[in-house]
Amino acid sequence: MQHETLLHIQGIDKSFPGVKALSNACLSVYAGRAMALMGENGAGKSTLMKVLTGIYSKDAGTIEYLGKQVTFKGPKESQEAGISIIHQELNLVGNLTIAENIFLGREFVTPWGSIDWKKMHQEADKLLKRLGVSHSSHQLCSELSIGEQQMVEIAKALSFESKVIIMDEPTDALTDTETAALFKVIRELKAEKRGIVYISHRIKEIFEICDDVTVLRDGEFIGEKAVNVLDEDQLIEMMVGRRLDEQYPHLDKPRGELLLEVENLSGSGVHDVSFTLHRGEILGVSGLMGAGRTELMKVLYGALPRSSGKVRLAQQEIHNTCPQDGLNHGIVYISEDRKGDGLILGMSVKENMSLTALAYFSKSIQIDHKAEQLAVGDFITMFNIKTPSQEQQIGLLSGGNQQKVAIAKGLMTRPNVLILDEPTRGVDVGAKKEIYQLINEFKKEGLSIILVSSEMPEVLGMSDRILVMHEGRISAEFQRGEATQEKLLAAAIGKSAL
């Protein structure tokens, strides 16, 4: 069956100083169908979307939209033509209401020239209802969770009534309920003959909601296939050029002596938690969203206040009242929100990586920049970070490379305990494998690791021992050999282990 082509991108080339980002990149979007755009981090997906919407100019190639060749001069022009993009990074104004954010710059006006607040809120409420969001459009965006803010971004894109809607990692911060609501809307959009470009690293979502898939690798077009003729292994092989038969390369190594003891720890969202951690051990922490996993790590690290309990490191009791205390005691926390808490996107790779370790490069009151540069260079090589130079602005790197820099930044302080909170969120399958291999290297060197993850296969595949949290408490503990997804899920919802 032939489908109407809304958008056809052909033979796009784009180079930056020292880097060829796109080479003969292609993409077609069809009416009433969702096209997945897949590829590892750094494959060129975001660059191609920026060329399409006019943020970057192309070096070669053509863009046809609704049968006409076009070159957009910027996002405003492409949006007015009927191409909307939902960015992975939130772009909301916190002290404005939901309605004000949705219609910012496009406010409804009365015949008398004033803003028609009533109509604006009515239209915003309709969009929120369509997405299953229960909040009033009068609520400030600063009062919303990250997932709820993402739904506002989606509502904003829907308000344009676009022919083509590009969704860049739209479910990254969404709950299962919010994701189901989004998928319902995508199906409605397809029924209205809109075209969807769906960019995601969550392969299961591709098979659930998309009709076709286009794969880029190293900036080049690899192929376009109907989703129903592929399986997961074939799609992964297209993306990375090899099969990933062993996604979780667990290192079987005896753990060392007891390093960390947490006894009856309570604090913000955490109640009476006790556990231990040994040298060279990977301790997985599983649980549903809101179970208190991140809060526990932040209380342990000193980013959230502790109300009671004891923490002993190498048999010495410690009191982390702020993150600097955690760092001083050799505990490093790599946040789940690398862009909000972990990295400064406007600074360079070098500046980000060495920021918390400048004391190691200090000579009296001066920084030994040569030593800093050498150390950063070593980590770039060790972590296989793809960057033109140490001076590259980190916000221009792919998500996987940003995550590697965030982890390297923590390791520069030479910690005893490394807490990784959702270390592979928003990271493609190839970069995930590299991060898992790095984790095994850290383990081999005797580093103690706490791995917090929402992905049960990741926790099961990488951990030596697993804690499950429910409502701020430890609901179960499993040794590697006895844990299953069914047992983890049962403990996560508060049931007895199966």
UniProtKB/Swiss-Prot annotation:
The UniProt entry lists membrane topology as: Peripheral membrane protein
Per UniProt, what is the name of the gene that codes for the protein in this document? rbsA1
Provide the protein name: Ribose import ATP-binding protein RbsA 1
What general EC class does the enzyme of this chain belong to? translocase
Keyword list, A-Z: ATP-binding, Cell inner membrane, Cell membrane, Membrane, Nucleotide-binding, Repeat, Sugar transport, Translocase, Transport
- To which protein family does this belong? Belongs to the ABC transporter superfamily. Ribose importer (TC 3.A.1.2.1) family.
Q: Which residues bind ATP?
A: 39-46
Q: What is its main location?
A: membrane
Q: What is its EC number?
A: 7.5.2.7
Q: What NCBIfam families has UniProt attached to this entry?
A: PRK10762.1
Biological role: Part of the ABC transporter complex RbsABC involved in ribose import. Responsible for energy coupling to the transport system.
Organism superkingdom: Bacteria
Q: Name one GO cellular component term.
A: plasma membrane
- The answer to whether keyword Transmembrane helix applies is no
The ABC transporter domain is annotated at: 7-243, 254-496
Catalytic reaction(s) noted: D-ribose(out) + ATP + H2O = D-ribose(in) + ADP + phosphate + H(+)
Q: Which GO terms describe its molecular function?
A: ABC-type D-ribose transporter activity; ATP binding; ATP hydrolysis activity
Per UniProt, subcellular location reads as:
Cell inner membrane
The protein's matches in PANTHER family, at most eight in alphabetical order, are given as: CARBOHYDRATE TRANSPORT ATP-BINDING PROTEIN MG119-RELATED, D-ALLOSE IMPORT ATP-BINDING PROTEIN ALSA-RELATED
